[in-house]
Amino acid sequence: MKPTDRRLCIVCRLQRIAFFLLLLLAIPALVWAREPQHAPVPELPGKVEGGLTAEEVASRAEHTSPDLESKEREVDAAAAQVDAVLVGFFPRLQGDVSYTRLSYVAPSELPLGVQAPGAPVGPLSAGTQLVKTQPAVIESLRNNTQLTVGLSYPVTDVLLRVSREHAAASKSAQAARLNAGAARLKIRTDAKLTFYGWVRARLQREVAERAVVQAEQHLDDVRVAFQADRVAKADVLRVESQLADAELQRARARNLVAYTESQLRVVLHGSPAEVLEVGEDVHLALPLVPGFPPLTALAEEAADNRLEVQSLLASASALRSQAAGARAPVVPSITLVASASDSNPSSRVFAQTDRFTTSWQAGVRASWSPNDVVSALASGRSYEAKARSADAQLKSLKDSLAIEVAQAVQDVENADAAIGSTARGLAAAEEGYRVRRLLFQAGRATSVELTDAETELTRARQAADDARVDQRVSRARLHHSLGRDVVSSQLP
């Protein structure tokens, strides 16, 4: 064979090898070209015009809460008690009307002795003729009618007991109003937290929906690769298991949405047919808090603003006023009394006649009982002990508020810190998933690596959503913990 022919044969062989290699490279491309088209990954929905916001939910919960209605009725009861005690400052006016039918009693005879008919008034002269007279007959009247109007004014009771009972009732009414106001603010805060819990569940559902779509795309990719003998059957089964798990998480997320929506409907007390949509853009992060004052200053602010603290102060003051009023019987009771009566017959007329007679009387009455003194001192000690118990509760409440404020501040700081880190993590996870899928389609990445990228992307999406919701939840709690929502509230 000539050298020229030998060189031509080698060239032909190289051309055939190149053609065969190009054909091998084209087959996967043709296979990938037949990959089924999927629906795009769903985007998270934004706010809906006319949808619910946290403030709207709080307002509706406030106006429909049965717990708040109960507290307001307690306020009415306390106000009525103040009116009842106020009457004690005025003199006591009392009217009595009585009628009595008496049994028959034989008339009484009153002997009148002897008389000297015609004799002048004065000493009788000797020899004056005396005549024995008939005895006077006194009839017993069987009908007894009496109309009496009495007026009394307990001087010492008004000074020592009624005035302090009125102060105690006024403080109790103030405590009831403060309790109702505190309940109102707590209901509003809890309603906001319920709303954000529902929003969080909806975001979790959307993330789960996107995870299912990604798992379906991964399964189709790995099936195509399996047909091209680029992956093993075990890789296909692994992705099928991943898809099944994603579908399970989606079902749980949907159930969580249904549960939190039922909670929200209970809070709103609305119609079951009402369609609930989110009217607040929770995809936007809130501005970061630049910094906080010292925790001691925040705890003092909470103690000054929170209505629960003011309510306990009013309750303790009411108990001490009750203790002072309970000790009033230690001092003798002095009462001014007066009365007027119209009686038939009158006990002040002798002899009794069948006619009405008007009379009056006025005086001062003093009374004192050692038994009442012992009871009053014991009652006073009881109220003082209750007042000291209220003082201890107040100290415990302030300690709890300090812890609550510290926790709320930490939650705000953690949520703000998570905003930046989760945003960076989500961007990295999205880009990592995109690149990893392209590498897998090109045969330069394994199915396990793509699965890890999908898992990381789902986790990053969930973390980013949680961070934005946590911002709103933590601020609502901090606002309530510091008592800054008291300014915008209207006490009953």
Identify the function of each model-found stretch.
Residues 17-29:
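Bacterial N-terminal signal peptides
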Residues 39-50, 96-151, 281-292, 324, ...:
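Small/polar, glycine/serine/threonine/aspartate-rich low-complexity segments that form flexible
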Residues 70-85, 183, 187-206, 217-219, ...:
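Amphipathic alpha-helical coiled-coil segments
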